[in-house]
Amino acid sequence: MSVLGTCCCWCPNLYIAMMGFFRRRFTKTQVYDILSANDPNLTPDISMRAVDHYRQAARLTSICAQHPAVMGTRDICALEKRAATNIAAGNALMDQLNKWTMDRAENSTTNLVGIINDINS
């Protein structure tokens, strides 16, 4: 992992400040590239964050389903909205991860060798 990425792991406030800075100036893919310094170990971290969003959405949905009589309509709507937001956030992370992975694959030497071999065969 890059030095910047390591520092952000040790200090959450620095991570939050850096992400705020990056979000205003770069796309998510560029942020991943900067923080990872082409480190393949970043991919599982992004996947885990997406899974966390999906788990949160599932938990909120199950709360709505299990306790509809206790909760009012307004509370259920609020939880369903939060669940939908978490699902959208998870989907956005996975979309960016897929795009980032494809961008890296398109530029990788291994992929280039495979294309050349296909052309020559």
Swiss-Prot record:
It comes from the Viruses. This is Uncharacterized protein ORF38.
